[in-house]
């Protein structure tokens, strides 16, 4: 089932949606004008047939750029980077990245508020957004790419074997003799359970017990991205696998198991993880190939609810824990902060939190984050006992991110406080309110890549 990422960009315009029921994106048309991107149009493939989508926007004076995706060669779009003008809300520039390359920057100007549409290990199968005379916003549908099988390389001796396709790999055991790789054993993950498969011969062609060498993967936080294999003839016989080494998503490289030879093959597929092995073997590993599939999705990091700061009045509220914070609304009143509400992200979906406190005629001030690259690291503020209040109220709030600091909302007075934890980011808020904001606290999670 496709996962929908909400559209990024300015407000307004007419909503449009190409849908998600395509196998791939095959061509992208972008027309730029003086105010930014005028229109965008996509071509897709569905059930093996080309589907030409409608124009989203209006064609005026300008120029059109196109980007073709070679889907027949396994190429697919994995992410979109763009920016939009804060005043007009018009998208100014777009750049599309596939599993093989990046497009040129399409449009006039790459300044403004930047955004990214991406779900790691997934491909884009459809787009949606809004437009009027120009393109105002752009969102996308993502699906996991189908597994691919890369044919084995090496010799033709022995019999074929195939471990099949799994969720991921936890550990690899490689046994080698002085002349070749003799045995491979893999601990695979299959929906949270370990399944072990092995092929080859521990004694090898020399009939001497070999010592298995282990390479442990920190699954599901790490996965194997590529295998380097060398092959050569052994004692005038058929080609056999002489050495192996592995690279992971954490930029780790295993030791080289065996002795490297001249003929080198690298199995990899950008944006995918190694999920299975196949090849040929008898007394040794004669040939080796690979299956690549979607990378594992690690579980969310553990969260910690930090004690709030402020007074004890009002009723308790707790938004819970999310993947991150996208936007903050702060409403001020006569005595201090009258109300707050937050927009969160959960599984790449917007979640609008409830209003905490009482909305005033002054309305809300907004602080929007460049999510997911930007996140809140700390909240600073003041609380004070004010006339007519049953307890101390929050009179000022300021939000620090990994990139910048928000303006102060309210006035510095009373007791200062800082909410946060080293190496963590804010993923939720809690506190006490009604009719004013009396207390605020945060829920944090470890910062991960």
Swiss-Prot record:
Gene label: JAL20
Domain spans labelled Jacalin-type lectin: 2-144, 147-294, 303-446
Molecular function GO terms recorded: carbohydrate binding
Record-linked SMART domains: Jacalin
Annotated region (Disordered), positions in chain: 1-20, 294-314
Pfam families attached to this UniProt entry: Jacalin
Residue numbers of N-acetylalanine PTMs: 2
Family (UniProt): Belongs to the jacalin lectin family.
Name of the protein in its database record: Jacalin-related lectin 20
UniProt keyword annotations, A-Z: Acetylation, Lectin, Repeat
Cited Gene3D superfamilies: Jacalin-like lectin domain (2.100.10.30)
GO CC list: plasmodesma
């Amino acid at each position: 089932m496709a996962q929908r990422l909400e559209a990024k960009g300015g407000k307004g315009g007419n909503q449009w949606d190409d849908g998600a029921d395509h196998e791939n994106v095959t061509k992208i048309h972008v027309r730029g004008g003086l105010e930014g991107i005028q229109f965008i149009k996509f071509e897709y493939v569905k059930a093996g047939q080309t589907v030409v989508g409608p124009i989203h926007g209006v064609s005026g004076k300008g120029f059109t750029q196109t980007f073709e995706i070679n889907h027949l060669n396994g190429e697919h779009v994995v992410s979109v980077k763009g920016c939009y003008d804060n005043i007009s809300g018009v998208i100014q520039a777009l750049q599309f990245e596939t599993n093989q390359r990046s497009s040129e920057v399409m449009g006039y100007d790459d300044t403004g508020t930047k955004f990214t549409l991406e779900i790691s290990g997934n491909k884009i199968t459809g787009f949606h957004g809004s437009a009027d005379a120009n393109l105002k916003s752009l969102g996308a549908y993502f699906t996991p790419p189908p597994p691919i099988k890369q044919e084995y390389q090496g010799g033709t001796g022995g019999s074929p074997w195939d471990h099949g396709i799994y969720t991921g790999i936890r550990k690899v055991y490689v046994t080698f003799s002085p002349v070749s790789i003799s045995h491979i054993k893999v601990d695979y993950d299959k929906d949270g359970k370990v399944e072990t498969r092995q092929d080859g011969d521990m004694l090898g062609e020399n009939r001497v017990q070999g010592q298995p060498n282990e390479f442990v993967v920190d699954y599901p936080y790490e996965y194997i991205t590529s295998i380097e294999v060398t092959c050569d003839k052994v004692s005038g016989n058929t080609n056999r696998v002489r050495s192996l080494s592995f690279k992971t998503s954490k930029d780790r490289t295993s030791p080289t198991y065996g002795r490297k030879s001249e003929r080198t093959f690298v199995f990899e597929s950008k944006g995918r993880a190694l999920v299975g092995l196949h090849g040929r073997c008898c007394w040794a590993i004669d040939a080796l190939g690979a299956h690549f599939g979607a990378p594992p999705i690690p579980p969310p990091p553990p969260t910690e609810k930090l004690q709030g700061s402020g007074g004890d009045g009002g009723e308790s509220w707790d938004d819970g824990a999310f993947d991150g914070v996208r936007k903050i609304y702060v409403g001020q009143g006569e005595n201090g902060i009258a109300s707050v509400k937050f927009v969160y992200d959960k599984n790449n979906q917007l979640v609008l939190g409830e209003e905490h406190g009482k909305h005033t005629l002054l309305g809300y001030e907004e602080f929007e984050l460049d999510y997911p690259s930007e996140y809140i690291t700390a909240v600073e503020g003041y609380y004070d006992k004010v006339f007519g209040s049953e307890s101390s109220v929050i009179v000022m709030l300021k939000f620090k991110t990994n990139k910048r600091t928000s303006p102060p909302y309210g006035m510095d007075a009373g007791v200062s406080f800082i909410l946060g934890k080293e190496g963590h980011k804010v993923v939720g808020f809690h506190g006490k309110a009604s009719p004013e904001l009396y207390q605020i606290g945060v829920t944090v999670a470890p910062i991960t890549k």
